[in-house]
Regions:
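Helix N-cap and loop-to-helix transition residues
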Residues: 9, 46, 67, 110-111
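Mature-region segments of soluble proteins
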Residues: 52-55, 69-172
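Hydrophobic/aromatic-lined pockets within catalytic cores
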Residues: 18, 22-25, 61, 123, ...
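Residues marking the start of alpha-helices
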Residues: 4, 41, 102-105
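C-terminal segment of N-terminal export signals and the immediately downstream linker at the start
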Residues: 7-8, 25-61
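N-terminal secretory signal peptides and thylakoid transit peptides that target proteins
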Residues: 2-24
Length: 172
């Protein structure tokens, strides 16, 4: 009797089992979201480093209703020749800290509280501060994210908040 060869379809691969945290490496130089609705090319960082950076961004500014693609766009700016060494070294330190607590690496640390613990231990480091401060503008300046928070954008060009309804927000 011939044994049936086990196969893995593209759909099965993309639907989940290969994910690392919120993002996973799909090939040399590429990172994709666990939903496979987005992917990004990396040129100066390792794809695994970018996947970990995306998870780190999500842990620093957690929003369940914000998709991974926005976090990926927020950290894409670190994929430069000038910052590659600092990012690779910082992520290696993050992974080492996770391994010191018994996890395979930071991105594969299953519980958010364990990842946040690791981040709290390094929150005063220049690496953490660089990522955290860059995320403030990298994440929240994306116009596509604004509606997710109920922000309608600036009002000056439309007559200001007084003429536009300065008290129409429903999230406070």
């Amino acid at each position: 009797m011939l044994k049936q060869k086990a196969t893995l379809t593209r759909r099965q691969l993309l639907s989940g089992s290969a994910s690392i945290g919120t993002a996973f490496v799909i090939g040399i130089g590429y990172v994709a979201g666990s939903s496979a609705a987005w992917a990004m090319e990396v040129t100066h960082l390792k794809p695994q480093t970018m996947a970990t950076l995306i998870q780190m961004a999500r842990d620093i500014y957690p929003h369940d209703h914000v998709a991974d693609e926005f976090y990926a766009a927020a950290v894409k700016g670190y994929d430069t020749e000038e910052q590659a060494d600092m990012i690779e070294t910082g992520i290696a330190g993050l992974d080492a800290a996770a391994q010191g607590k018994g996890f395979a690496n930071y991105a594969e640390t299953g519980w958010e509280r364990h990842r946040v613990d690791i981040l709290r231990n390094m929150e005063n480091s220049p690496f953490f501060q660089t990522i955290r401060s860059g995320l403030v503008t990298g994440l929240y300046n994306q116009k596509a994210v604004w509606p997710l928070f109920g922000y309608e954008g600036e009002s000056y060009s439309q007559g200001g908040y007084i003429d536009r309804g300065f008290d129409d927000i429903n999230w406070i």
